[in-house]
Amino acid sequence: GMKILKLLLDEICETFDVPYLHIGTDEVHFTNPQFVPEMVAYVRDKGKKVISWNPGWKYKAGEIDMMQLWSYRGKAQQGIPAIDSRFHYLNHFDTFGDIIALYNSRIYNADMGSDDLAGVIMGIWNDRLIDKEWNMVLENNFYPNMLAIAERSWRGGGTEYFDKQGTILPVDENSEVFRNFEDFESRMLWYKEHLFKGYPFAYVKQTHVKWN
């Protein structure tokens, strides 16, 4: 099995001129304790850095180049750069609610990146075959969410982590949280009109809506 996998890795590394290769390691039972370390070493010998899921294979600093955190159990480790994907699976989202939480969320509950916090990735993990590919972009609100997480990752900060009450805007329209999202919403709608015209951009203004 390892011999065949190495042949596949040869083909992948020859085909894709990229600096990183993600090798997975989540949701599987390992019977050979040398399997993952040998695969990591093999990919590194190809001149590429290796990413692995967490939870997944248990690494120490220096044994892997980067970890991608998934599920609530994903934890960053000192000495290993981490990508936060834990609450960023868009197919789990509510279209008009969770973009607020995404915009307000502190990535890995930190103010800014560091040597141990490399950034964030959003994912669309649809489990069903969809007739039209663009439906995934539309139904998962991809472009608005992309702009929300891009701004948060570029600017840092945020008010809380995604798993708290951030899907609801404050009632007080003068609060900093409300005004910040209102400002972002205005700029996002400008992008919708000017740069995403003709693309499936599933968002309309909502900060003016009052709920009783």
Label each region the model flagged:
Residues 1-66, 72-77:
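Active-site neighborhood of glycoside hydrolase catalytic domains
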